Amino acid sequence: EASLRFPNAGVRFVRADVERDRLGGRFNAILLYSVFPHFRYPVDTIARLVTDNLYCGGRLLIAHSQSREQLNEMHKRISDKVFARDLLPVAEQVAQFTEIGLSVASFDETDEYYYILLQRVGRKLSASVADAIY
């Protein structure tokens, strides 16, 4: 629907299972809105998207328009219907990303939102990122 509403926006909309499917091509930006808790392999998935699908300098945004506490509580109520894992405190999640060599440009969480902005800074995979995803 979005691609029909904005046909000349210079944006390519892709709907995919980013854990299972390989995305074709590279992008300047990837937005993962309200999906991160549903990843079974969150660090591996993000590492693969950053290294395989972002141009150098490209950014990947993990975004939620609710707090971590609200999201975790909601997912507990519907755990029999959909897979979701608890969101970690944003600083802990960022530490997992930086531990394997990913570059985090900014991050924050409040009682209204949760986000992490990653950026691809190099052309080559670091050994730790490669080990995490391959």
Give names to the regions the model predicted:
Residues 38-50:
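A short, conserved alpha-helix within the catalytic core of class I
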